[in-house]
Regions:
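Bacterial N-terminal signal peptides
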Residues: 12-20
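Cytosol-facing boundaries of transmembrane alpha helices in integral membrane proteins
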Residues: 3, 17, 29-30, 47
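Bacterial N-terminal signal peptides that target proteins for export
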Residues: 1-11
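Amphipathic, non-membrane alpha-helical rod segments
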Residues: 64-108, 157-218
Length: 239
């Protein structure tokens, strides 16, 4: 195994682990998607509701592509997320058809609220998708580090550098191992804690999203440090 290339590859992965989280931004308020009060006309209300549905379908389409193309996701998590996205892609157009068939402003308004309350695309579904991808990405990097650590130890043991340099490299490896262990602790259970959150649990389940985001951030920080340690070991040993 080319330890130098592996170490540098892992260092790069460590910096990008959880990149999916960058897309996790709530871009829509947790309110009705209509632009005005219940006093607007029925036709205008239906049009506004349709726009709200189409916007969410656009977001879900992007999420579906992200999930399909992600190299970080586990097979089981990918399957679960694809099923959830597909259900929303079926449910939202069906809801829109109901709204377009409503004959009173009151009924259309009531049904329109379901675009938000029944799906929570922007405050729950989209963020949790990105968090699951990010968490799985961190886990994958942790696993790669587990392969790298004994390789680096062997490299240190067999190196012809001075005892002082070898001791410095060993200290880096101890720090690297500690950071990877911390990352594993932070990320443990994160994906499973959010993947099955539902709109019905909002806003109570917002705390899980917040906690997951913080754990991912902490784990990514540890991995970035571990990646720096790996690169420094390689530099010290001239490998």
């Amino acid at each position: 195994m080319n330890t130098r290339l592996l170490a540098r590859g892992v260092a790069t992965l460590a910096l990008t682990a959880g990149l999916g989280l960058a897309g996790s931004v709530a871009v829509d308020a947790d309110t009705t998607p209509t632009p005005a009060s219940q006093t607007i006309g029925l036709t205008a209300l239906k049009a506004a509701c349709n726009v709200a549905v189409q916007r969410r379908l656009g977001t879900l389409a992007a999420d579906a592509t992200f999930v399909k193309d992600s190299a970080a996701l586990t097979g089981s998590d990918r399957t679960i997320l694809e099923g959830q996205i597909s259900a929303d892609q079926v449910g939202l157009p069906a809801l829109d058809r109901t709204i377009q068939g409503d004959t009173t402003g009151k009924q259309a308004w009531t049904d329109c609220q379901m675009i938000v309350t029944g799906y929570r695309v922007y405050v729950l579904e989209d963020p949790k998708i990105h968090e699951v991808i990010a968490a799985d990405g961190v886990t994958k990097v942790d696993e790669t580090f587990a392969t790298l650590i004994p390789e680096l130890q062997s490299l240190i043991n067999n190196s012809s550098v001075s005892a002082t340099v070898k001791a410095e490299a060993q200290a880096d490896l101890v720090d690297l191992t500690s950071k990877v262990d911390a990352s594993q602790t932070s990320i443990s259970g994160v994906a499973s804690s959010v993947i099955n959150l539902t709109p019905a649990g909002w806003p109570g389940n917002a705390v899980q999203l917040t906690s997951a985001a913080q754990n991912i951030k902490t784990a990514r920080t540890d991995l970035a440090g571990a990646g720096a340690d790996a690169n420094h070991i390689i530099q010290l040993l001239g490998a």
